[in-house]
Amino acid sequence: MSEELQQKLRDQLWEVANKLRGNMSASDFMYFTLGFIFYKYLSEKIEKLANDALVDDEITFKELWTMEKDDDVEELQKVVKTECLENIGYFIEPSFLFSSIIESIKKKENILPMLERSLKRIEDSTLGQASEEDFGGLFSDIDLASPKLGKSADDKNTLVSNVLLALDDIDFGVEASQEIDILGDAYEYMISQFAAGAGKKAGEFYTPQEVSRILAEIVTIGHARLRNVYDPTCGSGSLLLRAASIGHANEIFGQEKNPTTYNLARMNMLLHGIKFSNFRIENGDTLEADAFGDTQFDAVVANHHSQQNGVLLTSLTVMTVLVKQVVLLHARQPIMPLYFT
């Protein structure tokens, strides 16, 4: 994809984000915007997968779910649902797709109850599945009853509807082979823009690309391929993704203390095309409860943010101590979590 098209998508998504901004803080409108983008991506991805699976049956995903029920229809629905769960880890019935929400908006309907159910259905579809931990509570930060969206129910519905309509006009490129590059890049750009607006708090969830690139290149020195990579304070996962990409790592592991940032990290993994079975992000304080114990890792990267003498160490401060305090392990033995001090 050309840089021109890449920049166009970035600009379009940032314009959508600013429709939500209003009186919200950078972090508040970040969670709503990124959550809605992610919902559209999941909807388009599953619709494409299901339609491709039904080509020989000469029906579409939506048509199959509106057909009169009989044994054959139910069996085919079961086959499609199973294929989706095995391949992408979740399932969305056609009536809860992003495109169905758009149809309701165009009919001037109140879409908030339906949207809330749609997000919940995505999470619930993974219960008992191998992907349950990757999707559980993923949309918990999207509070559609929040007064930040408007004073009245109508105000909230109007604002959210306008944002979703604006997203509907943007081509995410899910039909194209470059979908991962397109959305992954745009999502990272959005997070970086929100980080810029968050000021000193940015270091809690985002590592600038320059820092990520340096760490990722160091961690791959002398290694054509890493088996796995780990970040004990992974934030939104940008550093992990960069290290995994440059090191061609098969598996990604991370832990994040902040529940909201933990959700961003999982979304970031999925939007970059990392299969649910190839990453494991845990929510918790690594110092108090290390989720990975004696797990062996080929490499560890970290951009830790902490208080030192009352001063918050952000990623920019950390740049001065990277060589001394980021320890990169190509492990043949169990490792202990590593931190900046």
Say what each PLM segment does.
Residues 54-56, 276-277, 303-304, 322-324:
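Short, surface-exposed linear patches
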